[in-house]
């Protein structure tokens, strides 16, 4: 049944062209839809891709024509509309703060969604020639960390350091560029205490028995970001109910020490910071009281970001942030994925069976503000799409590796038009509030054209074929780089995608090759029913067979059910 559900989304594509399986392999290759395209992996190792993921990105800002106006519009949660992005300091450094993780467990794909989204924003700002100071924190002391450490009998700082390191490893695997600064709360207690003092001095906070609370009634703009009225507000998830508070919505800036918990000395006695004050203090320390972009998941709008605004403005009346950016949830069965709900899937669990960039491709396939429903079926589609993209570029690279283009040689008009269309669609979609799904779709036509040039008789005869291939590969490489999908080597990425497919199928390559042998023998003996069964058996677990003049090979594919439409032998 699961396999049948996986196949359902692909049946219309398969049914639309039943005759393709009978075409010669190379002709069928050029006509087949991208998600179902047969791919091949060379048995020898060609030269590595000339552009490593991060080094290529560093120069990606040169990808657009000089002097072209490229205006970025971003949806601002505070104004509830898209706005033209204009840096606070024209020509200066863009300040961007994104709320980081509380490292008390493995990070899940809800975290991946947030940090991939802001990584794309970081990359695109740099592509547009902005200098960016990107700050993403670690909340390395918190109620949840303390509770988990007590549960495991572990030091809280040791636990948070371990999970912080794991998080950084996950981010690297997902091709998220390192932020400019990654501050930890425990290293910024002095800054936090100083900000709390300023808030008290400005009559917006009060101390009770070693605790310090922010007084929301003394901040008239409270609720502007979330659109909540003060009477409707409730204390946030991490704000304990305390009858001593002047207003139930007042939240903790400083928590008095409890036995067995980490604490620091302060003017109000030993204790530790509240959740919200930490980000206000660290963002002000690294970016100043006013900066350009503050981001996070939409679950942080209230109470966390609402409280941040109140604290920062109470500490410094000139404090302001121009753009509040929030990403949507990852849902499981229409319910937000989160650790507290117990329905989360960790990044590590997913990447045991899928290439990390397949997960990134899946996340970028939906606009960052829209909810995304996590399904294995969609991961399979993303993985297949990634394989097709890398295989096309690998084929192109191998074809062009001995070719040297002459400087100034004009390209055919159709090639120039294809490249310009890709460039325009990429920039238009990305500049419209980072529509990554549209940007990804923009490479589909160039990839099809490249496959025509690589594998069809007509394409191979086209004038300046290799020059066209090289130019299109370069432009697609730029797009993949800005989206964080460019591997250091197409060939190595293809191998890794194949290894993950074998793991999902619970098979070894030797077992697949044995099945191919059995099928070849069955075909020679004209046992076509048996041959068909072997093909279907492998297709059901995501292994597609391709017959060619040099024999039968295999590639990863979207798994199909035994009842699914599979190309006949």
From Swiss-Prot:
List of residues binding Zn(2+): 99, 279, 304, 308
Cofactors, names only: Zn(2+)
InterPro entries: Cys-tRNA-ligase, Cys-tRNA-synt_Ia_DALR, Cys-tRNA/MSH_ligase, CysS_C, Rossmann-like_a/b/a_fold, tRNA-synt_1_cat_dom, tRNAsynth_Ia_anticodon-bd
CDD domains: CysRS_core
EC number: 6.1.1.16
Keyword Coiled coil recorded: no
Keywords for the protein's UniProt record, in alphabetical order: Aminoacyl-tRNA synthetase, ATP-binding, Chloroplast, Ligase, Metal-binding, Mitochondrion, Nucleotide-binding, Plastid, Protein biosynthesis, Transit peptide, Zinc
Co-factor: note: Binds 1 zinc ion per subunit.
A Pfam family per the record: DALR_2
Annotated GO MF terms: ATP binding; cysteine-tRNA ligase activity; metal ion binding
Span of the annotated motif 'HIGH' region: 101-111
Residues spanned by motif 'KMSKS' region: 336-340
NCBIfam families assigned to the protein according to its UniProt record, in alphabetical order: cysS (TIGR00435)
Family, as annotated: Belongs to the class-I aminoacyl-tRNA synthetase family.
Function: Nuclear genome-encoded factor required for normal assembly of chloroplast polysomes.
The protein's name in its UniProt record: Cysteine--tRNA ligase CPS1 homolog, chloroplastic/mitochondrial
Species for this entry: Oryza sativa subsp. japonica
């Amino acid at each position: 049944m699961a396999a049948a559900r996986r196949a359902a989304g692909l049946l219309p594509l398969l049914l639309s062209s039943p005759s393709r399986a009978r075409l010669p392999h190379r002709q069928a290759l050029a006509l087949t839809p991208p998600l179902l395209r047969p791919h091949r992996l060379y048995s020898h190792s060609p030269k590595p891709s000339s552009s490593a993921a991060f080094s290529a990105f560093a120069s990606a800002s040169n990808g657009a024509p000089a002097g072209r106006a490229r205006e970025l519009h971003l949806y601002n949660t505070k104004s509830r509309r898209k706005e033209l992005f204009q840096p606070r300091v024209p020509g200066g450094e863009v300040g961007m703060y994104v709320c980081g993780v509380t490292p008390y467990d493995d990070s899940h794909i809800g975290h991946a969604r947030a940090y991939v989204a802001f990584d794309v924003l970081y990359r695109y700002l740099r592509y547009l020639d902005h200098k960016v100071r990107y700050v993403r924190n670690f909340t390395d002391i918190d109620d949840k960390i303390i509770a988990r450490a007590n549960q495991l009998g572990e030091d809280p700082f040791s636990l948070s350091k371990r999970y912080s390191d794991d998080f950084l490893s996950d981010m690297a695997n997902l091709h998220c560029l390192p932020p400019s600064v990654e501050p930890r709360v425990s290293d910024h207690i002095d800054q936090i205490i100083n900000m709390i003092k300023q808030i008290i001095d400005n009559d917006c906070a009060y101390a009770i028995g070693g605790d310090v609370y922010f007084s929301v009634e003394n901040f008239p703009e409270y609720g502007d970001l979330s659109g909540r009225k003060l009477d409707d507000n409730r204390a946030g998830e991490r704000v304990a109910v305390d009858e001593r508070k002047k207003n139930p919505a007042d939240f903790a800036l400083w928590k008095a020490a409890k036995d067995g918990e980490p604490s620091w000395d302060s003017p109000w006695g030993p204790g530790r910071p509240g959740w919200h004050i930490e980000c206000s203090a660290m963002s002000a320390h690294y970016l100043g009281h006013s900066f350009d972009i503050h981001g996070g998941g939409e679950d942080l709008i209230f109470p966390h970001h609402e409280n941040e605004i109140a604290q920062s403005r109470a500490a410094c009346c000139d404090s302001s942030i121009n753009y509040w950016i929030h990403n949507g949830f990852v849902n499981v069965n229409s319910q937000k994925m989160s650790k507290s709900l117990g329905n989360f899937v960790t990044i590590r669990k997913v990447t045991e069976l899928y290439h990390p960039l397949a997960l990134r491709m899946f996340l970028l396939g939906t606009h960052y503000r829209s909810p995304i429903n996590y399904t294995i079926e969609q991961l399979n589609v993303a993985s297949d799409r990634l394989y097709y993209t890398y295989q096309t570029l690998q084929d192109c690279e191998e074809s062009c590796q001995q070719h040297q283009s002459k400087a100034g040689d004009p390209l055919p008009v159709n090639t120039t038009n294809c490249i310009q269309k890709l460039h325009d669609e990429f920039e238009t979609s990305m500049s419209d509030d980072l529509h990554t799904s549209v940007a990804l779709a923009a490479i589909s036509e160039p990839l099809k054209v490249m496959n025509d040039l690589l594998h069809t008789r007509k394409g191979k005869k086209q004038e300046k074929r290799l020059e066209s291939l090289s130019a299109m590969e370069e432009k697609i490489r730029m797009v993949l780089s800005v989206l964080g999908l460019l591997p250091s080597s197409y060939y190595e990425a293809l191998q890794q995608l194949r290894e993950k497919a074998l793991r999902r199928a619970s098979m070894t390559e030797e077992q697949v090759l044995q099945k191919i042998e059995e099928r070849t023998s069955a075909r020679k003996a004209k046992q076509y029913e048996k041959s068909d069964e072997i093909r279907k058996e492998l297709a059901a677990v995501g292994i597609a067979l391709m017959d060619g003049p040099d024999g039968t090979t295999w590639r990863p594919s979207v798994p199909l059910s035994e009842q699914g439409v599979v190309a006949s032998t």
